[in-house]
Amino acid sequence: MRLPQQHMRKWKSQMRLMIPLEKMVDESIAFLREHEPPDGYFVGFSGGKDSIVTLKLCEISEVKHQAFYSATGIDPPELVKFIKREYPYVTWLRPKHSFWWYISKNAPPLRVARWCCDKLKKDPSKKNPLKHRVMGIRAEESPRRASRPRMEYVKHLKQTICKPIFRWLEWHVWEFIDEHNLSYPSLYDEGFDRLGCVICPFLTGRKLREHQERWPTFYRTFEHAVRRWFSPEVYNRSPMLQRFNIRTVEQYLEFWYGRQKEAFPEITDCCRVIQPFEGGYDKSQLNMFRNI
């Protein structure tokens, strides 16, 4: 099976130093079996490489489980087609409203007010009775993820997040995919190393340009929704917009695409648990985002 070539050098250097795949697989299967709840696992499936491996491990371990995909409406079309074709048995969960509706009626998501994950991914599954959630989260992905426990209880949701491949490195993931001859989205072969929402406040620089060039329709729709939302009244009731002197929709789009990173340097990735305007920022500046 042909695997993406752009990271092979890195994977080979990792393989010389790290735990063999077989041991990682055995440990992950034991983890799933040890913590299996009587009613079974809720498996979060995104169609990316990590969730592909995680779902396969659930199948191999023969634990009771159901797989669910949060259909955000802003995932890459290539990814959505892949899920439909290769995983027709995965249950789709849809948000109450579209991403564009939430923007035009409330506000675009920001690094410090990232409502999109909750509204598009988490809320649709809240009423699901399966409270043990298996996720393909790996510590290697970011320092923020590495700092959190492998078994994590989310009190306000009454859910337990289980991370069977938490200690896996990227080469483990691709080696497993190769050994089991698993299909994966073609975007990986085109140079994309992580797949997620086409529109995201954490995209900047080269990655943002890649997304804009690859999926221009999404960005035209996004800008249309922002224009429907922005108005002089929005500016007048927003201390945040006043603070950054954002008076026009063009200035806002410039800020959204490029200046958020400078304005909120302490918010570095979308894995972070957001505490809006911590460290001296005035939380009241985000009141305009609270009524979503």
Model-derived regions: residue spans:
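ATP/NTP-dependent adenylation/nucleotidyl-transfer catalytic domains that generate, transfer
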Residues: 179, 185-292
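ATP-dependent adenylation/nucleotidyltransferase module used to activate substrates
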Residues: 1-180
